């Protein structure tokens, strides 16, 4: 089983991202689970969401404490939250940032096995006209993890957002897939 933990802020779409990733994996015949964890429910407050993906039925219903993959939608969280808490050895960290690999590693409490960086905010602003990074970051997740195909992510996005909005969000995921830089550490 692969466990993914998303870190974002209220209003950024971390919960939607977790659900879309689960839908994409389900399309590929996997068993999935996606759910949020809310502390103080307000716009801008830290939000955590989770996705589990497996080849077998998933029976556990707890939060994810030892993720294989951590996805950070808001880079300012690197200064306030230990996003690598419980990260499995050799785990993958995916960060929406313009910063360098060295700058990001300096902020992580645990060194991942793989680090993926993409300016999902820049991509979202360019394509969507809004700094909502959840669909763009899923392109980075597809590239860095290989858990799902980009096409499955795009299909799931178009099912979540209809019409032109779905097309634009699918394009944002593709752009992020192409621009994500993955470092083996």
Swiss-Prot record:
It catalyses: 2 oxidized [2Fe-2S]-[ferredoxin] + pyruvate + CoA = 2 reduced [2Fe-2S]-[ferredoxin] + acetyl-CoA + CO2 + H(+); 3-methyl-2-oxobutanoate + 2 oxidized [2Fe-2S]-[ferredoxin] + CoA = 2-methylpropanoyl-CoA + 2 reduced [2Fe-2S]-[ferredoxin] + CO2 + H(+). The keyword Oxidoreductase applies. One of its GO terms (molecular function) is 3-methyl-2-oxobutanoate dehydrogenase (ferredoxin) activity. Transmembrane segments: none annotated. Its EC number is 1.2.7.1, 1.2.7.7. Keywords: Oxidoreductase. The keyword Oxidoreductase applies. SUPFAM superfamilies: Pyruvate-ferredoxin oxidoreductase, PFOR, domain III. InterPro entries: Oxidoreductase_gamma_subunit, PorC_KorC, Pyrv/ketoisovalerate_OxRed_cat, Pyrv_flavodox_OxRed_cen. It comes from the Archaea. Heterotetramer of one alpha, one beta, one delta and one gamma chain. NCBIfam families: PorC_KorC, PRK08534.1, PRK14029.1. This is Pyruvate/ketoisovalerate oxidoreductases common subunit gamma. The lineage of its organism: Archaea, Methanobacteriati, Methanobacteriota, Thermococci, Thermococcales.
């Amino acid at each position: 089983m692969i466990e993914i933990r998303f870190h974002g802020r209220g209003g950024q779409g971390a919960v939607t991202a977790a659900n879309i990733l689960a839908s994409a994996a389900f399309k590929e015949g996997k068993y999935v689970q996606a759910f949020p964890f809310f502390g103080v429910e307000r716009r801008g407050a830290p939000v955590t969401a989770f996705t589990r993906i497996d080849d077998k039925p998933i029976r556990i219903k707890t939060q994810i404490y030892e993720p294989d993959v951590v996805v950070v939608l808001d880079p300012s969280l690197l200064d306030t939250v230990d996003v690598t808490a419980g990260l499995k050895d050799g785990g993958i960290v995916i960060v929406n940032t313009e910063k360098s690999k060295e700058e990001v590693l300096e902020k992580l409490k645990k060194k991942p096995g793989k680090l993926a960086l993409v300016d999902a905010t820049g991509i979202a602003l360019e394509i969507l006209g809004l700094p909502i990074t959840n669909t763009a970051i899923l392109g980075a997740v597809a590239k860095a993890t290989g858990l799902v195909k980009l096409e499955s992510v795009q299909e799931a996005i178009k099912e979540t957002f209809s019409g032109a909005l779905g097309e634009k969000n699918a394009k944002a995921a593709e752009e992020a897939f192409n621009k994500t830089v993955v470092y083996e550490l």
